[in-house]
């Protein structure tokens, strides 16, 4: 009789399903025999223009050092981040993407406590908290956004952490500064608030200064990533800023060398250069063109402050998604976020957006 390895897992893991990523281009090419060059991917909120050329130069210069382990402390990158935001290096925690930070927080909370977050929120929150043995306490959304008053009511003596994505993924809603400050003022100091700002640069630009909240709220942790606007999704590097004590706790469970050497070099170079996508508002025109095209198709979408739109098709989105895939267009169905009639569409180049809109028009007419 073979062993039941699922039974060996903790109860929270037994109830989980693996995280489903945006379908890779190579995978669709294999499945349907489509030439990769014909495939348009607007599924993972990536930067379609790629990183700054200086980043590529820095990575090439590091290739000869691949035989060496990276700096496990991430000293240079932490120093650059600290200088940029007027913090101390001991307030910075580095992660293998910002979802690594979310996982570190959940692991520190462990079994027993509960984590509060909104419906339609990033899937990493329930995955990480349940895997750690914590209870996921999901608060119903208001207009697909965070119900901050509802979150406050959900807090009890067992609440360890609140996760707030701002802007939210996959809906794109944003909590304004005044509402956020009022919320933070009312959260008990014993409860950690994780402000997940993976997409904040698309709203405030790369000069966003939300990190100054750390002075007022010692129970706040702000997480960000270089995967989105900086175009480093393939290298996986994120960071958080918090009080030194919170950072110390996270570093106790952080895996050795969790950020690889190429990612560290690229992040240092990328952080000191401006995003070519945001420069001059270069991503605004594609957003407008995509919205105009959706309006011509008489479709509705949730107003977004990220580099994506959650589009309501008014019917089951799965067949529409399948039709788009057959035409070589990859977007993201979000039925798993309790949005079965929606597709999340990343903002691409003008050509990519036009290709998506034409494919969508054809599928809707079938």
Curated annotation (Swiss-Prot):
Catalysis: reaction(s): L-histidinol phosphate + 2-oxoglutarate = 3-(imidazol-4-yl)-2-oxopropyl phosphate + L-glutamate
Amino-acid biosynthesis as UniProt keyword: yes
Family to which the UniProt record says this protein belongs: Belongs to the class-II pyridoxal-phosphate-dependent aminotransferase family. Histidinol-phosphate aminotransferase subfamily.
The protein's Enzyme Commission number: 2.6.1.9
Pathway: Amino-acid biosynthesis; L-histidine biosynthesis; L-histidine from 5-phospho-alpha-D-ribose 1-diphosphate: step 7/9
SUPFAM superfamilies: PLP-dependent transferases
CDD domains: AAT_like
Cofactor: pyridoxal 5'-phosphate
Domain of life: Bacteria
One Pfam entry name: Aminotran_1_2
Disulfide bonds: none
Native source species: Stutzerimonas stutzeri
Entry GO MF terms: histidinol-phosphate transaminase activity; pyridoxal phosphate binding
Name this polypeptide is given: Histidinol-phosphate aminotransferase
């Amino acid at each position: 009789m073979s062993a039941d390895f699922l039974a060996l897992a903790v109860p929270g893991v037994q109830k989980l399903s693996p995280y489903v990523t945006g379908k890779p281009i190579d995978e669709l090419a294999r499945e349907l025999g489509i030439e990769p060059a014909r495939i348009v991917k607007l599924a993972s909120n990536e930067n379609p223009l790629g990183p700054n050329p200086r980043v590529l130069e820095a990575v090439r210069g590091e290739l000869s050092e691949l035989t060496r382990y990276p700096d496990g402390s991430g000293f240079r990158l932490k120093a650059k981040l600290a200088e940029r935001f007027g913090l101390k290096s001991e307030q910075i925690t580095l992660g293998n993407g910002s979802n690594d930070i979310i996982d570190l927080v959940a692991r520190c909370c462990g079994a027993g406590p509960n984590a509060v977050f909104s419906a339609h929120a990033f899937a990493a929150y329930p995955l990480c908290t349940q895997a750690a043995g914590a209870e996921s306490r999901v608060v119903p959304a208001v207009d697909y956004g965070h119900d901050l008053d509802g979150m406050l009511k959900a807090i009890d003596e067992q609440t360890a952490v609140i996760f707030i994505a701002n802007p939210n993924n996959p809906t794109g809603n944003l909590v304004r500064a005044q509402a956020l400050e009022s919320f933070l003022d009312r959260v008990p100091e014993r409860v950690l608030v994780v402000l997940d700002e993976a997409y904040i640069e698309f709203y405030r630009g790369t000069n966003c200064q939300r990190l100054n909240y750390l002075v007022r709220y010692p129970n706040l942790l702000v997480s960000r990533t270089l995967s989105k606007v900086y175009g480093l999704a393939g290298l996986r590097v994120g960071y958080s800023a918090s009080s030194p004590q919170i950072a110390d706790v996270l570093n106790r469970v952080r895996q050795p060398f969790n950020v690889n050497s190429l990612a560290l070099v690229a992040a240092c170079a990328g952080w000191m250069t401006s995003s070519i996508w945001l420069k001059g508002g270069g991503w605004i025109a594609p957003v407008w063109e995509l919205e105009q095209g959706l309006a011509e198709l008489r479709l509705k979408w949730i107003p977004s402050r990220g580099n994506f739109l959650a589009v309501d098709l008014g019917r089951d989105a799965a067949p529409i998604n399948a039709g788009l895939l057959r035409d070589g267009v990859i977007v993201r169905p979000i039925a798993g976020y309790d949005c079965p009639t929606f597709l999340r569409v990343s903002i691409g180049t003008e050509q990519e957006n036009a290709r998506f809109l034409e494919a969508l028009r054809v599928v809707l007419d079938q």
